[in-house]
């Protein structure tokens, strides 16, 4: 991938995001594959690191439920994930607790910028699953229903953190290619072709 933006312009983009001007970071002068991006972006490395963190937290809670039949950790994690994804969908990953930790971990790594819109779509799915898990676990439902949903979440988190495969972004691209989602100029560049829409560029 080729992406360039003067340091001052990147800082300006982050500052604009902090003021809530846009979802994601607007970075004037950001060039990816010879093309200047206009729409908000996220750092793919931070997104993948955040997926890894949530996977570890979720795996610990799942272990308590599976091996010791203790569901309080799973109940607490489901509620935390509900808040986490609500913040991501509303304000972006830089303001969520896990997103802040991921940004700290990736602070010394060169960013890989990707369009924010498909990620928001994927996190909306995560928000729905977290809401369902919160309702299920707080309703006293135990057994394979919450554990199966947790396994689905862990699988999706592992795919994104380890392989860079965003299933929610894949679904976004699938819907867009069939015309069920209208062309959106905010989708300009995708990590490893994860959203694969005709008007988007692929970033390696």
Question: Can you name each region flagged by the protein language model?
Answer:
Residues 2-204:
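Membrane-interfacial helix-loop segments of redox and metal-homeostasis proteins
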């Amino acid at each position: 991938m080729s992406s360039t933006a003067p340091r001052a312009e990147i800082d300006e983009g982050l500052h604009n995001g902090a003021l809530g001007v846009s979802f994601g970071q607007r970075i004037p002068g950001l060039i990816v594959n010879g093309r200047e991006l206009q729409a908000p972006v996220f750092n793919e490395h931070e997104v993948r690191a955040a997926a890894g963190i949530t996977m570890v937290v979720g795996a610990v809670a799942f272990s308590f439920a599976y091996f010791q039949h203790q569901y309080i950790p799973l109940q607490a994690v489901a509620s935390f994930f509900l808040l986490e994804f609500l913040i991501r969908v509303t304000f972006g990953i830089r303001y969520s607790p896990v997103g802040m930790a991921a940004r700290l971990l990736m602070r010394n790594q060169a960013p890989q910028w990707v369009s924010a819109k498909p990620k928001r779509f994927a996190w909306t799915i995560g928000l729905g699953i977290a809401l369902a898990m919160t309702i299920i676990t707080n309703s006293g439902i135990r057994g394979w229903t919450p554990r199966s949903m947790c396994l689905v979440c862990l699988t999706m988190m592992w795919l994104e953190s380890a392989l860079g495969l965003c299933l929610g972004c894949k679904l976004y691209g699938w819907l867009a290619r069939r015309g069920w989602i209208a062309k959106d100029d905010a989708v300009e560049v995708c990590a490893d072709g994860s959203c694969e829409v005709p008007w988007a560029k692929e970033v390696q």
